[in-house]
């Protein structure tokens, strides 16, 4: 941070980007990326008022600052919160995504080494983890990278994340897009599908306005209900089967997965979900404790939990952000993302028509 002759604080004039490789210590781990930046680059980030953190993975990411603040951005605060969603989606509970023999997109060489991680994908979406989050840059306050699948076959996986320090963010372009959906009640749409043209239009806006460091915010338009946005792997078995089952009947999904862990997927009859309801109350008690909610709110939350809709079961957001950077070609910004990342529109009830409206906002970091 610089100071002018009058003592006024002067912010750096150019955003700075730090690329980090992280090594998780366990399958589920919390890593302070601020500490990683400090240990490798000193106080180079401290002169900026904001920091954008971006994960390039579909089972590791960040929490919004409001949630992270409740949890104190520390392992002691974050882990109980994450454990709630790991309870909802236990590891190895017979998910369709984990039936590797059915994964036609995998090559013969990929199948033996593909991790069985449907639980991590679902916990990522349910727990409202994001791939791209902007934080107020408060030196000394952790910024937690939360990994839900950091170790495979006993070996830590290499994780990549980017941290951009910037002082201000200005809007340079907006647009409204229409995304067609099917007539099905439960639907997931890959917004990266070239046939939709979403990415092409976003890329053109970035090019027209010469954005080199910034982000693209995709938001559901006001009035769009029973839908959400996430960034994850758009794999058919995961999206159409595992996630689809959650959206259609969250309690039954929990019941069947709990039964599967007991060795009998049908241990809890579909017609009676008392066990699932009981487990759900316990889960929400843990969530309330993790977030430090006031006791006066607990009863209200739990009274709604028994008839909990998918919108509460999955804490999915109404917007996602895509990183724009010129780190690969200086002066030419483009969308930067992980190999398997796709923005996904999810609906759990039909809308008024077979389409959803998205608002696009392109911003530049300065």
Q: What are these model-predicted stretches?
A:
Residues 2-366:
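Active-site histidine-anchored catalytic micro-motif
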């Amino acid at each position: 941070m610089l100071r002018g002759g009058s003592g006024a604080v002067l912010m750096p004039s150019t955003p700075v980007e730090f690329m980090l490789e992280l090594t998780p210590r366990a399958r589920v781990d919390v890593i302070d990326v601020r500490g990683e930046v400090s240990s490798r680059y000193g106080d180079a980030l401290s002169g900026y008022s904001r920091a954008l953190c971006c994960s390039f993975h579909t089972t590791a990411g960040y929490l919004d600052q409001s949630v992270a603040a409740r949890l104190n951005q520390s392992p002691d605060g974050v882990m109980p919160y994450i454990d709630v969603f790991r309870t909802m989606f236990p590891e190895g509970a017979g998910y369709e995504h984990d039936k590797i023999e059915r994964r036609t997109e995998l090559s013969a060489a990929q199948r033996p080494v593909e991790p069985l991680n449907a639980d991590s994908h679902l916990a990522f979406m349910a727990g409202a983890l994001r791939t791209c989050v902007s934080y107020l840059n408060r030196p000394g306050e952790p910024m937690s990278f939360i990994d839900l699948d950091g170790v495979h076959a006993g070996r830590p996986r290499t994780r990549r994340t980017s941290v951009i320090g910037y002082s201000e963010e200005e809007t340079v372009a907006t647009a409204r897009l229409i995304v067609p959906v099917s007539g099905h009640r439960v639907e997931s749409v890959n917004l990266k599908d070239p046939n939709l043209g979403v990415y092409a239009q976003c890329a053109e806006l970035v090019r027209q306005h010469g954005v080199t460091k910034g982000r693209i915010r995709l938001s559901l338009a006001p009035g769009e209900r029973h839908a959400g946005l996430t960034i994850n792997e758009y794999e058919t078995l995961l999206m159409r089967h595992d996630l689809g089952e959650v959206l259609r009947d969250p309690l039954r999904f929990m019941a069947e997965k709990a039964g599967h862990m007991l060795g009998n997927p049908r241990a809890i009859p579909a017609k009676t979900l008392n066990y699932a309801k009981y487990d759900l109350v316990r889960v929400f008690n843990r969530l309330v404790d993790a977030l430090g909610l006031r006791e006066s709110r607990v009863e209200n939350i739990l009274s709604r939990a028994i008839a909990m809709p998918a919108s509460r079961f999955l804490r999915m957001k109404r917007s996602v952000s895509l990183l724009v950077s010129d780190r690969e070609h200086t002066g030419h910004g483009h969308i930067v993302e992980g190999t398997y990342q796709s923005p996904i529109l999810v609906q759990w009830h039909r809308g008024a028509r077979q389409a959803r409206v998205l608002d696009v906002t392109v911003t530049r970091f300065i």
